[in-house]
């Protein structure tokens, strides 16, 4: 299809960023919902309440340390992306759940969200139950147009 593919090994700092993603996400969620958590706890959806309950123990120091790891990981990923046009990864570990209660398991895109790198989902095939399964094109921070172009290329190649 006009592309060469190779496997890449990510530096340990990128793996560490993936591990600390929840610190950033949960701390920021707790900050964003602080008023609701304090004033309207019982009116909040149960899943959100549980997540906010689980995030109460993170401190500002935990958050800042995690942000330092994320910044180092973004720099390391930028170094890798100097040698390749795009990273290609699965969008999720399986088919999405049925219904609208959840978008599914986010673990395959949470790193890119943390690092602020563009990632574009491309439907790869339709699984049983008419549920989509996708891949994602990931490019360097700020290279949004490149991610969109790569997604278009992948979409054409998968037709």
Language model segments and positions:
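Short helix-loop capping/hinge segments that flank enzyme active sites or metal/cofactor-binding pockets
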Residues: 4-6, 23-74, 78, 123-134
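Gly/Ser-rich, acidic/histidine-flanked active-site/gating loops
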Residues: 1-20, 57
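Small-aliphatic-rich amphipathic alpha-helix that forms the alpha element of a beta-alpha
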Residues: 76-78, 103-123
């Amino acid at each position: 299809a006009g592309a060469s593919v190779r496997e890449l090994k990510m530096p340990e700092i990128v793996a560490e960023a993936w591990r600390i993603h929840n610190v950033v996400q949960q701390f920021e969620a707790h900050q964003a919902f602080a008023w609701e958590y304090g004033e309207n706890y019982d009116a909040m959806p149960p899943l959100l309440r549980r997540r906010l309950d689980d995030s109460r123990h993170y401190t500002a120091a935990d958050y800042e340390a995690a942000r330092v790891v994320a910044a180092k990981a973004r720099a390391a990923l930028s170094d890798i992306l100097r040698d390749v046009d795009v990273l290609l990864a699965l969008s999720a570990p399986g088919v999405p759940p049925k219904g609208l209660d959840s978008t599914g398991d986010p673990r395959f895109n949470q790193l890119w969200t943390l690092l602020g790198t563009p990632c574009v989902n491309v439907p790869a095939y339709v699984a049983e139950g008419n549920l989509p399964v996708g891949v994602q094109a990931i490019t360097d921070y700020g290279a949004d147009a490149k991610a969109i172009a790569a997604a278009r290329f992948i979409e054409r190649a998968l037709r």
